[in-house]
A protein has these predicted regions:
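Short gly/ser/thr-rich secondary-structure transition/capping motifs
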Residues: 13-21, 83, 142-145
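Catalytic core of membrane glycerolipid acyltransferases/transacylases, capturing the structured
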Residues: 13-14, 26-84
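Short, basic, glycine/proline-bearing loop/turn elements
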Residues: 7-9, 74-79, 105-110
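Alpha-helical membrane-targeting segments
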Residues: 1-17, 65-75, 151-155
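Short amphipathic alpha-helix with an adjacent loop that forms part of the alpha/beta core around
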Residues: 24-26, 93-94
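Non-catalytic C-terminal accessory region of glycerolipid acyltransferases
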Residues: 86-226
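A secondary-structure boundary/capping signal
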Residues: 22, 35-37, 59-60, 105-106, ...
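Structural motif corresponding to alpha-helix initiation and N-cap regions
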Residues: 20, 65, 86-89
Length: 226
């Protein structure tokens, strides 16, 4: 996995021009869940390259084919079936238990990136691992009315901002489902708020909202376990 860090850095700083803020918000040790907004297929790699710590990102299982699949496997990324993949969540939990970092794009599909809705996988992971969640705002990877599959030209300016970490836990007398719903709402609110703050700081807006969602993105997965 070590070789993938320079590759991620090169994508952010040689192919594109990525400004990064909030690195000091990322815990320097122990497990961390990075939860980013999702507007482009580049979001996962850009978040990976901007992070001060290496991470394993949940990637749709269909990407693990051929040469790209070998690269993803060798760099430590995690295949996930987004229709519901408890095994992927358990693998992520095991990595967090070992003090590693996991990246997830909990909106689940590419869209406007406002984090108006997220899936339950990130909440399950936070509650069952105890790892802090760092909201990550990713801006510039898609803009205006660019298509969901748009490939930005080299040299475009991106912005990645790491927000304040939040730690979630179960409350006394709270059911598993209630804990999941509350945790998901707290993560969603933190991510949405951080995206708004990053827009004001960087001056880079989100793309226009699309009426149809694409289902071929790096994402988390819903979890019904309590």
């Amino acid at each position: 996995m070590a070789w993938s860090r320079p590759v991620g850095w090169a994508l952010d700083h040689l192919v594109y021009r990525t400004s990064v803020t909030g690195k000091s918000n990322v815990p320097t040790g122990g497990p961390v869940i990075f939860a980013g907004n999702h507007i482009s297929f580049l979001d996962g790699p850009v978040m990976f390259g901007a992070s001060p710590r290496p991470m394993h990102i949940l990637v749709k299982q269909e990407m693990f084919k051929g040469f790209l699949g070998r690269v993803l496997t060798a760099s430590g990324q995690l295949p996930v079936d987004r229709q519901g993949d408890r095994a992927a969540l358990q693998r992520s939990k095991d990595l967090l238990a070992a003090g590693r970092c996991v990246g997830i794009l909990p909106e689940g599909t590419r869209g406007s990136g406002e984090a108006s809705d997220i899936n339950g996988g990130v909440a399950w992971l936070a509650l069952n691992s105890g790892a802090p969640v760092v909201p990550v705002a990713i801006l510039g990877t898609r803009a205006g009315d660019e298509h969901l599959d748009f490939v930005p030209r080299p040299g475009r300016r991106f912005h990645v901002s790491f927000g304040t970490a939040l730690t979630l836990g179960r409350r006394a007398g709270e059911s598993g489902r209630a804990s999941m719903d509350r945790a998901a709402q707290e993560i969603r609110a933190a991510l949405a708020g951080h995206v708004r703050d990053a827009i004001q700081l960087s001056g880079q807006p989100l793309p226009f909202a699309e009426t149809s969602k694409d289902l071929t993105a790096v994402a988390g997965t819903p979890a019904d376990d309590h």
